[in-house]
């Protein structure tokens, strides 16, 4: 009974919710064998043709390359790209690529030399003699990626599935209208595909290997059955035609009955899926030693006169392929890369073929129909009925249009496979897939910005923590350095400070001498000044005598003598009071020079005044005033306390006073005569 149940379950297939049945339009291109076309004169090879980062460039402008030569290094998850033919690298520059907006990607531009020479190829015909890790590395370095449309690096995918996968599924459904690349490849290269499947099974070692193919490909089914006639390790499952049966989650559910959880992947339930084109590329990389330099591309649509499937070299401009298919463009001709439901319109035809290019559709105006105007959603729920991912497209539409990113995320917009079934059935002609693509791009941008902000915050907090640790370490060092020294060290420090202070005090202390004390050389200075005064008096005596004989008044002479005596006493008193204070030596020298200048000036004035007649009354008044001032100064001098006197200044002042006294006496003698 268990054997009957297992046999029944072995061939059982399941179904998924939703899905549509659009016109297939496959007979235009699947009736003719694969063909080669002439090489293009120039190839543009984008460095990024897969999910993930681009590889590191390893060629320069002017280098000559061979077909299959690596143009970039494949380190980590970076997948290398290879030269599609032999020629010369003429540029490494940004170029428009296969993208709805024709975004520019860094590309290697090669001028073909027409020789199409290969690198030296080394195949592993006995691949079982090599380890699984070596096979994965070879697949990765030979640039094999998912050729079903995703472009995920095959080596990375296999590395993550070792010893975790129970079911290996080969996707041969090819459910989208117009596309027949996989169909034709299975018809012409079934044996090579099966060999590639066995290489994948050797690496993953799953419990079962399933090939899922729709029933609208009878020739391909026949070829595969012929190759698998005596095989028991691979099962061929023919499934009903329904779009999108070729989706990874949908085909997994059809063949295994298991559903991939929201936000998860097929590997979460022990399933790994590869495309038939990928299996063929694995065989060529491992057994033949050929990197992926070409792939099958469907050329179809009523605007081409020779539709079919061709071997297209990667990097070939789309224009070159269409021209070889008899492209007859109309006034407003549209060219779609991919199928009519999941593909995108090319802005121009100079973009190159890449690893994920499976179809070039050039429909006529009648084939596409007149463009329909978008109207408001009527909430008919037709989109929800057609959605194969069990989503609510009408709600996602409102959330996307209203920029409600959180609600769109909560309604699992990330699970949308962008199959276009909802837009196909929408009676309001709303391009729902375009809204969903834009919303997912905005959500990804927001998450990327949040991630960058979190990383920046983490770096800032780490820096602040590091600065705090350094500050604490500095404070600890300062505290340890501030420990009090020993008692003997304190005594030595105190003695040194005392010596320094004593030296400073001696250097800044002024020389103070009490009033009345004179230096040892005061007598010599006084004698020298006296001799100088006598010499000056003799020189001035002759003119004074001459002027005196002219008839001076005796009373005027007496008054002048009294004034001179009063001034002399005043100057002596001032000299005594000033000498009692501490004096700066430089200041004393300046004051002495000023006093000498004043004395000379007074002598000159006295000589000039002596020649003029004097009023007796005026002289008497001046004499009385002089006596009064002299008495007042004597009283002030008595009241002023005696202070320390600078001996040098005192000596200078005393000498000046004596000179003036002698001068006054001489003047008096002259007047009396």
Swiss-Prot record:
Enzyme Commission identifier(s): 7.-.-.-
Q: Name one GO molecular function term.
A: electron transfer activity
Entry cofactor note text?
Binds 2 [4Fe-4S] clusters per subunit.
Annotated [4Fe-4S] cluster 2 binding lies at 387, 416, 419, 422
InterPro entries on file = 4Fe4S_Fe-S-bd, 4Fe4S_Fe_S_CS, Ion_transpt_RnfC/RsxC, Nuo51_FMN-bd, Nuo51_FMN-bd_sf, RnfC_N, Soluble_ligand-bd
Q: What class of enzyme is it?
A: translocase
GO cellular component term, pick one: plasma membrane
Q: Which UniProt keywords apply?
A: 4Fe-4S, Cell inner membrane, Cell membrane, Electron transport, Iron, Iron-sulfur, Membrane, Metal-binding, Repeat, Translocase, Transport
* Topology with respect to the bilayer: Peripheral membrane protein
Cited function: Part of a membrane-bound complex that couples electron transfer with translocation of ions across the membrane. Required to maintain the reduced state of SoxR.
Oligomer status and interactors: The complex is composed of six subunits: RsxA, RsxB, RsxC, RsxD, RsxE and RsxG.
Q: Quote the protein name from its UniProt record.
A: Ion-translocating oxidoreductase complex subunit C
- Classification of source organism: Bacteria, Pseudomonadati, Pseudomonadota, Gammaproteobacteria, Enterobacterales
Q: What gene codes for this chain?
A: rsxC
